[in-house]
Amino acid sequence: MKRILWVALALLVPAVYLAQVAGQIQKQSTVDEAQIADAIIVLGAAEYRGRPSPVLEARLNHALWLYLKKMAPRIITTGGAGGDPVFTEGGVGRGYLTRHGVPPEAIIVEGEGDSTAYSVTAVGEIMERMNLQSAIVVRDRKSVV
């Protein structure tokens, strides 16, 4: 009986610890730690014939909110063409933001990226060229930077 109790305890303690760590990670992932920056970067996501997917629209809405709070004077939208070569994720983002009141001159489009890694590299080059030192990156919990 003692042995069963020890085995149960040996399994329960790590499980409780793991659940606690997972809860803390989940809690921290919802905290918005944005500080005033030179630019807001919106990572691309799917677009459907010129319309942002729900994921992209959520990112754009958050970028718009940050912009209206004056967290940065510029927004950089990223992402190239997917299945439809007429539209790019970055271009769709620009259109969405201008329709929602962001002046076109405040938006920079990186429309070549076919991956997050490519877009981040391209944005780094844009920021260096424009002497932008800091950025707020808008993404969702499932994207990895």
Descriptions of predicted regions:
Residues 1-32:
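N-terminal type II signal-anchor transmembrane helix
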Residues 21-145:
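A structural signal for short, hydrophobic/glycine-enriched beta-strand patches
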